[in-house]
C-alpha cells in the first residue's frame, strides 16, 4: 500500500488454504550495499555449520556480514564464524522473550530490530539481499501497531491482524526467494519494537485464522475509512477481475461513529450564503457564465450532490447541482446550474486529500461531505474500531467488510508456544558433572557460552565428533558427550514408533550417550542382534535384551524399518487388570 493509501497491484497470486502459513519471508530494505552490521540480543546459530552466536540485551554480540569475491562472510569478535555462498542466521527459540537482533545498514531497515531468522544472499550486482524468515504472527508485530494503535479495542486489532495476514499471503511472489517486501506497497513491515502488548496479543490470538475464497487466499484490502460506503477494486484499478471478492455496502458506522477528523463538511443553510468563501466564489463564477456579467451572491436556495460515479453507488457522487439567488446590475435573479464535484477540491472549497463526495439534506439546508481517507476497499480501520466499541467481535466485523470471503482455520504454528525451537529435539538429558562448559562449536577451542552444574536439563539436537549439540538455558551449544546423560526421547506421534532389526558388523561398545567419550555399558560382539529405535547424528539408540544405549552407525548393518504400535504393546502386557468393570 502506498503512503497515500492506494494499493499497488503488482501480482494477483493465489495460495491454497492447505499451505503452511507458519512463516513468511520478507525482503528487507538494506540499501545497495555489500555489508551490514548486526547486534544480537539472544541465542542464534548459523544453519550452514551449526555454530552458535549468542548475545544478550545487556551485552549484545556484534557481528558483520560482508560480500567479497562472490562469497558472504559472517564475522564476530575478530574471527570468521562462517563463509559461503549463503548464510542463514537462525534463532534457537522463536519466543519473543528469547531476544532479537538489530540491523544496521544504509536502507529503511537501518536500526530496526527483528525477530525470526535472517537469510543473507548475493544479488547479481554483488550487493547483499537480506530476507527475514519470520513466524507469521511475529511479522504482524511489525504491521498491526502501525496500522492501528495500542489504544484501539482488542477486537479491532484482531481484525487488523487477520486482514494483514490475508493481505500478505494474497500478495506473495512466486519464483522469488521471498514472499513480500517491507515497502509500503506491501503494508510497510517495520520489524519488532517491544511495548505493543495488546497489538501483539491480537496477532498471537488470531494465529491460524485467515480469509479465503474457494479455498484460496485472496487480496484482502483495507484502509483508514471508506467515507460511509465501501468500494470495488474496479473503481480504483480500472478492471474488474477482483470485483467478485468485494461488494458495495453502506457503512453508517464508519461515517457517523468513526473519526470525524477523516472528513470535511460544507454546511449550507438555505436562504443564506455559505461561511466558506471559496464555495461562494465558485458559485459566483458559475452564475456569471449564465447571467453574462458579474454577480453578487445573495443566498443559496437549493443544493444536491448527485450522479453516482460508479454503478450501484449511493454515496460516491460526481456532480453538484445548485439553485441560488444573485444580485445583478438590473436586480435579483435566480440561477440554477451544475458542476463537477471534483471542483470543490480543485478550487479550494475542500483542502484535504480525500476521495469521495456525497451529501444529505438537513433541517435547515444541506451538507456536502468530502471524505474517504484511503481507497474504500475492504475493511475500514476506523469503522472496525467503532464496531468493536459497540461490542462486535472480530468475526462479526470481518463478516461485514469481507462478506464474500470466509474466515478459515489454517496451519500456522504459534511462535509463543512453550519451547518454540527452530530445531527438532532428538532427546532429553542432563549434565552429569559440575562446571560444564557449553561451547559455540564442537571442540574445547571454541568460546564458552556459559558454565552449568550437575542436573541441568538439556535438549539434545545432534552428535558431532564425540560432542553433543544441545540447548541449555535457551542457548544452542556443544558439550563433550561424556558430560551428558540421555534420559528420554520425544513421544512418537500417535504412539507409532519406527524401528528396525539390525546386527553389529564388528565388535563394538554400547555407550551411555552418542559419543566415543561416553561410558561403556557393555561390549558387543560381532553379529550381535539389536533393535534400532532412534538416531542422533552418527549414532543409533538401540536395545539388546534388557539393556539400551548408543552404538555408532558405522558398526551396524540395518534391515528394513517397520512401525510398531506402542499402545497395543502396553495394552497386551497390562491385560484386563486395570480396566473398569461394567
Indicate where each model-derived feature is located.
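Conserved, single-site charged/polar hotspot
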Residues: 1-467, 471-496, 506, 525, ...
Amino acid at each position: 500500500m502506498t503512503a497515500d493509501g492506494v494499493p499497488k497491484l503488482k501480482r494477483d497470486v493465489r495460495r491454497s488454504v492447505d499451505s503452511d502459513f507458519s512463516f513468511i519471508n520478507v525482503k528487507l530494505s538494506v540499501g545497495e550495499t555489500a555489508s551490514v552490521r548486526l547486534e544480537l540480543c539472544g541465542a542464534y546459530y548459523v544453519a550452514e555449520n551449526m555454530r552458535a552466536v549468542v548475545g544478550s540485551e545487556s551485552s549484545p554480540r556484534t557481528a558483520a556480514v560482508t560480500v567479497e569475491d562472490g562469497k558472504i562472510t559472517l564475522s564476530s569478535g575478530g574471527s570468521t564464524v562462517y563463509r559461503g555462498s549463503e548464510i542463514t542466521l537462525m534463532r534457537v527459540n522463536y519466543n519473543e522473550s528469547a531476544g532479537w537482533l538489530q540491523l544496521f545498514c544504509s536502507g529503511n531497515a537501518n536500526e530496526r530490530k527483528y525477530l525470526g531468522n535472517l537469510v543473507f544472499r548475493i544479488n547479481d550486482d554483488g550487493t547483499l539481499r537480506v530476507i527475514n524468515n519470520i513466524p507469521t504472527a511475529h511479522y504482524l508485530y511489525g504491521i498491526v501497531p502501525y496500522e492501528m494503535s495500542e489504544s484501539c479495542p482488542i477486537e479491532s486489532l484482531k481484525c487488523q491482524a487477520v486482514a494483514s495476514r490475508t493481505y500478505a499471503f494474497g500478495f506473495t511472489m512466486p519464483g522469488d526467494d521471498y514472499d513480500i517486501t517491507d515497502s509500503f506497497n506491501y503494508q510497510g513491515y517495520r520489524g519488532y519494537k517491544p511495548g505493543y502488548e495488546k497489538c501483539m496479543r491480537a496477532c498471537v490470538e488470531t494465529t491460524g485464522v485467515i480469509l479465503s475464497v474457494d479455498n484460496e487466499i485472496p487480496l484482502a484490502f483495507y484502509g483508514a475509512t471508506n467515507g460511509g460506503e465501501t468500494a470495488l477494486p474496479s473503481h480504483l484499478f480500472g478492471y474488474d477481475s477482483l470485483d467478485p471478492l468485494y461488494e458495495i455496502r453502506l457503512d453508517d458506522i464508519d461515517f457517523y461513529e468513526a473519526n470525524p477528523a477523516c472528513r470535511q463538511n460544507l454546511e449550507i443553510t438555505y436562504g443564506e450564503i455559505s461561511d466558506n468563501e471559496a464555495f461562494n466564489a465558485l458559485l459566483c463564477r458559475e452564475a456569471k457564465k449564465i447571467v453574462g456579467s458579474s454577480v453578487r451572491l445573495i443566498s443559496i436556495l437549493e443544493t444536491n450532490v448527485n450522479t453516482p460515479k460508479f454503478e450501484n453507488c449511493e454515496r460516491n457522487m460526481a456532480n453538484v447541482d445548485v439553485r441560488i439567488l444573485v444580485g445583478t446590475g438590473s436586480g435579483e435573479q435566480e440561477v440554477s446550474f451544475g458542476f463537477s464535484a471534483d471542483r470543490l477540491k480543485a478550487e479550494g472549497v475542500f483542502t484535504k486529500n480525500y476521495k469521495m463526495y456525497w451529501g444529505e439534506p438537513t433541517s435547515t439546508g444541506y451538507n456536502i461531505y468530502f471524505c474517504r481517507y484511503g481507497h474504500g476497499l475492504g475493511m475500514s480501520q476506523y469503522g472496525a474500531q467503532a464496531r468493536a466499541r459497540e461490542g462486535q467481535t472480530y468475526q462479526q466485523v470481518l463478516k461485514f467488510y469481507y462478506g464474500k470471503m470466509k474466515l478459515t482455520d489454517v496451519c500456522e504454528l504459534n511462535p509463543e508456544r512453550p519451547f518454540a525451537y527452530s530445531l527438532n529435539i532428538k532427546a532429553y538429558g542432563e549434565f552429569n558433572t559440575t562446571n560444564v562448559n557449553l561451547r559455540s562449536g564442537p571442540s574445547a577451542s571454541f568460546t564458552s557460552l556459559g558454565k552449568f552444574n550437575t542436573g541441568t536439563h538439556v535438549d539434545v539436537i545432534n552428535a558431532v565428533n564425540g560432542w553433543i549439540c544441545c540447548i541449555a538455558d535457551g542457548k544452542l551449544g556443544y558439550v563433550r558427550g561424556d558430560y551428558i546423560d540421555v534420559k528420554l526421547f520425544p513421544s512418537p506421534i500417535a504412539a507409532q514408533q519406527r524401528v528396525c532389526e539390525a546386527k553389529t558388523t564388528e565388535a563394538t561398545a554400547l555407550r551411555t550417550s552418542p559419543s566415543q567419550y561416553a561410558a561403556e555399558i557393555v561390549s558387543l560382539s560381532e553379529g550381535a542382534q539389536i533393535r534400532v529405535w532412534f538416531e542422533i547424528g552418527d549414532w543409533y539408540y538401540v536395545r539388546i535384551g534388557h539393556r539400551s544405549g548408543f552404538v555408532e552407525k558405522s558398526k551396524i548393518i540395518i534391515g528394513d524399518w517397520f512401525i510398531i504400535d506402542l499402545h497395543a504393546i502396553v495394552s497386551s502386557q497390562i491385560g484386563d487388570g486395570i480396566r473398569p468393570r461394567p
